[in-house]
C-alpha cells in the first residue's frame, strides 16, 4: 500500500483551513483598526498636550483649527497664536513667517470628524487663565472611534465611542 494523502483528504484539509481563516480574518482586521486608532490618538494627544504646555508658558491666546481633504482622505491640525491671518495646514506655504504656527499631520487610514473646520477654530486656548473653549472632535479609523473633549478648565479628555452626537454632524 502506498503512503500519502488522497485528493479527498487534501480537499477536506483545505476546507478546514479556509474556514479557520474566514473566522480569524475579521478579528485580525478589528485589532488592526484598533492599533491604527490607538497609535494615532497617542500621537495626537501628545501634540495637543505639547501645545497646551506652550500656551501655559505664554500670555497669548492660541487657536486650534482642523482642516481636512475628503477627496485625498487626509486631515491635519493647526495650532497658532491668535492673529488676523489664519494658517491652513493643508496649505502651509500660505502661512506667513511671523505667525507662530504648529502643524500636525495625520497618518493614513484615520479621519477627523468635527462640526468646525478651517477657517473656524476648533477651540481656543488661553495662556492667561489656562483655559480652553469647550469643544470636541472625533478621531476615526474605519469603524473605531475616539472622542477628544476640551473642557473650559483647560483639560483634554479621551473617551471611546461616548457622546459622539454632540461632536459629529448628522450628514457624516
How would you name each of these model-derived features?
Residues 1-29:
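N-terminal single-pass transmembrane signal-anchor helix
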Residues 23, 29-35, 42, 53, ...:
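N-terminal helix-rich module
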Residues 45-50:
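Phosphate-interacting basic helix/loop segments used at nucleotide- and nucleic-acid interfaces
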Amino acid at each position: 500500500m502506498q503512503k500519502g494523502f488522497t485528493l479527498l483528504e487534501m480537499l477536506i484539509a483545505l476546507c478546514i483551513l479556509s474556514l479557520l481563516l474566514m473566522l480569524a480574518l475579521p478579528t485580525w482586521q478589528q485589532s488592526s483598526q484598533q492599533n491604527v486608532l490607538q497609535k494615532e490618538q497617542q500621537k495626537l494627544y501628545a501634540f495637543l498636550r505639547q501645545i497646551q504646555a506652550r500656551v501655559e508658558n505664554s500670555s497669548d491666546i492660541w487657536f486650534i483649527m482642523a482642516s481636512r481633504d475628503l477627496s485625498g482622505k487626509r486631515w491635519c491640525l493647526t495650532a497658532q497664536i491668535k492673529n488676523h491671518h489664519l494658517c491652513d495646514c493643508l496649505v502651509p506655504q500660505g502661512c506667513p513667517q511671523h505667525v507662530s504656527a504648529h502643524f500636525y499631520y495625520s497618518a493614513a487610514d484615520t479621519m477627523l470628524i468635527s462640526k468646525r473646520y478651517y477657517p473656524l477654530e476648533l477651540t481656543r486656548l488661553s495662556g492667561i487663565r489656562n483655559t480652553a473653549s469647550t469643544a470636541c472632535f472625533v478621531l476615526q479609523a474605519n469603524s473605531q472611534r475616539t472622542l477628544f473633549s476640551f473642557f473650559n478648565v483647560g483639560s483634554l479628555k479621551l473617551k471611546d465611542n461616548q457622546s459622539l452626537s454632540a461632536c459629529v454632524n448628522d450628514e457624516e
